[in-house]
Amino acid sequence: GKRMHSKIQKQFLEIGGKPILYYSMECFQKSPLIQDIILVTGEDMISYCQSEIVEKYGFTKVCKVTAGGKERYDSVYAGLLCCQDTDYVYIHDGARPFVTEEMIQRGYEAVKRTNACVMGMPSKDTVKLADPSGYIKETPDRKIVWNIQTPQIFSYDLIRGAYESIRKKDMTGVTDDAMVVEQETGTKILLVEGSYQNIKITTPEDLAIAEAFLRY
């Protein structure tokens, strides 16, 4: 919300006349690979999500709308606790409206082989590592740098166990689910091609780009 300069949480802002969250929810609703959807939101938004997202748009696969936590990893863990009788979980940012059924399919084929995979795309920009003073420390080879997206897909037992383990430690600096699995299990995680269009809407400029994607 801060970077968007809005009092409304970014996933509830509208593009194309519908909340940003609607588009990814619709995709998972349509995919035959997805059995259940668990929607994690702020405690004060549960009622809104139930009536204005789930019921309004007929998202019948939503089996639970639950409260998240202060940090992203708290919310992911809350969602994992709601899962029942599942082999795999897709963890997706509600502010990424352009996930596709093809991505869901690619992720499923990968996770069946590896138990852990994440969507991403090779970086189009040169990336620099900085020292604490703001000077360039190193330039990684762009050929091996990927920008990571969601969904991130894991076998349920693997991701649940990794979160159970890391919650006993200092989680400062944990930025995504793959990092939790890397640190706590040592599992190799496969990179699966997502899409350059699979952006996370964070700033007003992103909103304008998303509107353009919907038009064209």
Question: Where in the sequence are the language-model features?
Answer:
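Short helix-capping segments at alpha-helix termini
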Residues: S31-L33, V54-V62, D85
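Acidic helix N-cap motif at the loop->helix transition within catalytic regions
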Residues: S47-I53
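N-terminal glycine-rich phosphate-binding loop and ensuing alpha1 helix
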Residues: G1-I46
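Short beta-strand-to-turn element immediately C-terminal to the catalytic PLP-Schiff-base lysine
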Residues: I15, K128-D131, V192, I201-T202
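Short, flexible, basic/aromatic active-site loop/helix in glycosyltransferases
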Residues: L129-Q152
